[in-house]
């Protein structure tokens, strides 16, 4: 939905970018004249008249064909028009996804009538292309590939799966909140000392031994990843689902430290705080349903279908993934609860205490003069002091949108070349913005020092690298 913000006395309104349409088609499904509708596998909004759907899909086909003559392997990525921008993605051969986003608008009043000015240069291709790619990755995580659906039951099954998934998922796309973090789609890692990390490793080994049907495990604390047995690309999209969808739905007042009283009303009156975030709500109910969401991983080679069991105690969450051919019983869920619950409760307390001790040792940080985003392409590690909270519905970036756009522009420049480089920009608002790319790592810094010169800005960034990333090599 468009958010309108009145801008002062001029009665200007700023209308955010919005999703105009989203569709998926396969040109091979309706090659003959009169069969064009067969190509369309999904179209949002559905109430659009049939001929308009066919016309829009036909136009996209023509654009793809035209651009293929210049770039056979990488045809159309995006199309810019005055009012909107179209993004194209071919995740599987001949399956095309298209997302049409309306450009932001400034609404002014002239002679008592509204006048609309489209902001054609505001949207960043890289950001919204990444959002479109994530739409596919999220679909694939819960449904497998488009081809798999075709093999399971032809076009009919694929259409049903697309409708069921995207009808809900598109409602969670808040395009006005998208920024550089959507390009990275990285993972925030929880900082840990070696001793506590070994405790967690030992806990995972014990759990996998006790619950021998567990194939993969992932461990998170405070919505940050500590350990994962999954492939990186599968974990990055599962992490996005957990932190932006599942965990926010189960928010509760978190308990700190081991001194908190144990809740006596826990299922089975066990002395722990463990509970299932997916699966049975009440283990004492003999009728309780043990249904877990299914996920698909390693779709490029072994193609594994798994049940996703997410279990949480205080701020610690564990994902157990078991083969989908083994249906989890209520008995198994009770066993998991009795084994994992008490140990995870103690472990969560230990992590919390250790984290607080480390925080005290490092001392209270005063508000620094800079904010930064860091991303490592090798392990997908992401760190941002710019975002206070990043969920699908809200991106509380603590800097002005103009600065976020500069960060995106620098990132686009970086992606065009393979060499390491550094870019320094002075914004109109007198902020300095620095981008550093070195050895598969990227660092973006925003400095609030309007009287500084280039040399001083460079020194500040060097200091930041020394304090925040002392074990990371950045080229000077």
Swiss-Prot record:
It is found in: Lysosome membrane. Keywords: Lysosome, Membrane. PANTHER family: VACUOLAR FUSION PROTEIN CCZ1 HOMOLOG-RELATED. It comes from Gallus gallus. The keyword Membrane applies. Belongs to the CCZ1 family. One of its GO terms (cellular component) is lysosomal membrane. GO terms for biological process: vesicle-mediated transport. Pfam families: Intu_longin_1 (PF19031), Intu_longin_2 (PF19032), Intu_longin_3 (PF19033). InterPro entries: Ccz1 (IPR013176), CCZ1/INTU/HSP4_longin_1 (IPR043987), CCZ1/INTU/HSP4_longin_3 (IPR043989), CCZ1/INTU_longin_2 (IPR043988). This is Vacuolar fusion protein CCZ1 homolog.
